[in-house]
UniProtKB/Swiss-Prot annotation:
Belongs to the RNA methyltransferase RlmH family. It is found in: Cytoplasm. The lineage of its organism: Bacteria, Bacillati, Bacillota, Bacilli, Bacillales. Specifically methylates the pseudouridine at position 1915 (m3Psi1915) in 23S rRNA. The keyword Cytoplasm applies. This is Ribosomal RNA large subunit methyltransferase H. S-adenosyl-L-methionine binds at L76, G108, F127, G128, R129, L130, T131, L132. It comes from Listeria welshimeri serovar 6b (strain ATCC 35897 / DSM 20650 / CCUG 15529 / CIP 8149 / NCTC 11857 / SLCC 5334 / V8). InterPro entries: Alpha/beta_knot_MTases, RlmH-like, tRNA_m1G_MTases_N. The keyword rRNA processing applies.
Amino acid sequence: MNIQIITVGKLKEKYLVQGIAEYLKRLTAYAKVTIVEVPDEKAPEVLSDAEMKQVKDKEGVRILAKIPDDTHVIALAIDGKMKSSEEFAADLDKLATYGKSKVAFVIGGSLGLSESVLKRSDEQISFGRLTLPHQLMRLVLVEQVYRAFRIVRGEPYHK
């Protein structure tokens, strides 16, 4: 399985970079996982609704340009469906079983995802009702992808 994690902005925090690198290394036994960073749109601290939409739209164009046509897209969205780790694992396994070998997870910037990205997505998921920084979400996602492969294969890790 080829998994892309498309995310807005450059990751600067060393502890997050190290954590993500560790899980990417572990994932090499299960899938080819790549992280694709698209530039975030510079914006002032306080934005009107129209300005927020404009920022998300510009970031959305950059995101969509990175998604190949034959890719199953899963957007991480606050209003997405919440799943347990077991459900997430089963869904990833079903994608592989039914020939969806290319999967892209999309993590928006600090303002979220544009409507165009949400429309392009095949599904939207949420990791809970808490708001997490989009940078931290990368680490949470790669850990859950790793956990999913371990669950599917019945390997120890998941408790």
